[in-house]
Swiss-Prot record:
Plays a role in the catabolism of L-fucose, a sugar that is part of the carbohydrates that are attached to cellular glycoproteins. Catalyzes the dehydration of L-fuconate to 2-keto-3-deoxy-L-fuconate by the abstraction of the 2-proton to generate an enediolate intermediate that is stabilized by the magnesium ion. The keyword Magnesium applies. Its cofactor is Mg(2+). The active site is at K222, H355. This is Mitochondrial enolase superfamily member 1. Pfam families: MR_MLE_C, MR_MLE_N. Disulfide bonds: none annotated. It is found in: Mitochondrion. The modification Phosphoserine is found at S148. SUPFAM superfamilies: Enolase C-terminal domain-like, Enolase N-terminal domain-like. Its EC number is 4.2.1.68. It comes from Homo sapiens (Human). Keywords: Dyskeratosis congenita, Isomerase, Lyase, Magnesium, Metal-binding, Mitochondrion, Phosphoprotein, Ubl conjugation.
Length: 443
């Protein structure tokens, strides 16, 4: 039962020094320190339940997101949770349409990352109070209630409330069977853990061999910095995994449009399923041009992890600019905005293959993609969710992978709650880890 008035909101800057091991390095982000703005909301319900939310960053700039969260806090404090979820669309619009803050958005950039962190905490709180994981909260929700959580502004030319309701009502058919299937088998995943650009060939081989031993059949490799290096590394991985297993590539926005086509034409020999983020995430027509050139080579376009909002996704779908749509649980406006994108993808029959990894992204997005299969897409064809084996030990309810699949979480909430000792240790700049590292970095 939903209860309580939100009485406190706190936010902390939490950073993990992943750059020291080359973890997460790609063609554009060469030395990331995986980080998060970590939000905790409390109520006056005196039940001890807290809502925890995060948004993912790469180190520097996390303090800016923290500042934006604090700027949004007045929209949340002293609100009854019952009133928020009773008019979630209205609350979402209140957060995203602040008459002054929207000028540094609107619905994009730092202020939208902050919005995601706050809303993720609200969803975590709601699900915990209901005693359900978020995916189950969504699956059990009446289609009309789900629709009421979505802001359809700017997308009604593609998806109306009536369209969304029709999709969700159709999704009720066979829902119980699909839920049983997920609980038994899990949602298929692929691994990005073995092929970061910061890794040596020996490390790549070692991690790839271990992934094969662990049962992984789908692998992603980072490309885009140096063509000859890409050719060598892709050859290593393809030789190790064999011709039957799936290989994906990710350029992390490195190329201009003609360069993307030329580069991928040379990497086509390694038979990638897709090239991810081949160019600027804002260049819808550029993606469409690349798609038109590469689809005849059997290479699809995947993008979305840095798409600002539902409008960019709408245009990518309209322009036939992608074959695989990658939602992000912290880039878009939390569950609310992701619902609209899942529904648009269903309408266009484009498979959703979420971006994950980072700090807590796997923990969050598993809820969305499991809900998508059970209640929206009803298909696993060409669908797979990213998995990166980093930093899960810092979460109270970490993801569970079995047989290279995400097993549906059973603990109440959004799986966003971090261990307090981890937060204190990695808080920037005064946590134990950074008190040791910062003086050394300055010398």
């Amino acid at each position: 039962m939903v209860r309580g008035r939100i009485s406190r909101l706190s936010v902390r800057d939490v950073r993990f020094p992943t750059s020291l091991g080359g973890h997460g390095a790609d063609a554009m982000h060469t030395d990331p320190d995986y980080s998060a703005a970590y939000v905790v909301i409390e109520t006056d319900a005196e039940d001890g339940i807290k809502g925890c939310g995060i948004t993912f960053t790469l180190g520097k700039g996390t303090e800016v997101v923290v500042c934006a969260v604090n700027a949004l806090a007045h929209h949340v404090l002293n609100k009854d949770l019952k009133d928020i979820v009773g008019d979630f669309r209205g609350f979402y619009r209140q957060l995203t349409s602040d008459g002054q803050l929207r000028w540094i958005g609107p619905e994009k950039g730092v202020v939208h990352l902050a919005t995601a962190a706050v809303l993720n905490a609200v969803w975590d709180l709601w699900a915990k109070q209901e005693g359900k994981p978020v995916w189950k909260l969504l699956v059990d929700m009446d289609p009309r209630m789900l629709v009421s959580c979505i802001d359809f502004r700017y997308i009604t030319d593609v998806l109306t409330e009536e369209d969304a309701l029709e999709i969700l009502q159709k999704g009720q058919i066979g829902k119980k069977e699909r839920e049983k299937q997920m609980l038994a088998q899990g949602y298929p995943a692929y691994t990005t853990s073995c092929a970061w650009l910061g890794y040596s060939d020996d490390t790549l081989k070692q991690l790839c061999a271990q992934a094969l031993k662990d049962g992984w059949t789908r692998f992603k490799v980072k490309v885009g910095a140096d063509l000859q290096d890409d050719m060598r590394r892709c050859q290593i991985i393809r030789d190790m995994i064999g011709p039957e297993k799936t290989l994906m590539m990710d350029a992390n926005q490195r190329w201009d449009v003609p360069e993307a086509v030329e580069w991928m034409s040379k990497l086509a020999k390694f038979k990638p399923l897709w090239i991810e983020e081949p160019t600027s995430p804002d260049d819808i027509l550029g993606h469409a041009t690349i798609s038109k050139a590469l689809v005849p080579l059997g290479i699809g376009i995947a993008t979305g992890e840095q798409c600002h909002n539902r409008v960019i996704f709408k245009q990518l779908l309209q322009a036939k600019a992608l074959q695989f749509l990658q939602i992000d649980s912290c880039r878009l406006g939390s569950v609310n905005e992701n619902l609209s994108v899942l529904l648009m993808a269903k309408k266009f029959e484009i498979p959703v293959c979420p971006h994950a990894g980072g700090v807590g992204l796997c923990e969050l997005v598993q809820h969305l993609i499991i809900f998508d299969y059970i209640s929206v897409s009803a298909s696993l064809e060409n669908r797979v969710c990213e998995y990166v084996d980093h930093l899960h030990e810092h979460f109270k309810y970490p993801v569970m992978i079995q047989r290279a699949s995400y097993m549906p979480p059973k603990d109440p909430g959004y799986s966003t709650e971090m261990k307090e000792e981890s937060v204190k240790k990695h808080q920037y700049p005064d946590g134990e880890v950074w008190k040791k590292l910062l003086p050394a970095q300055e010398n």
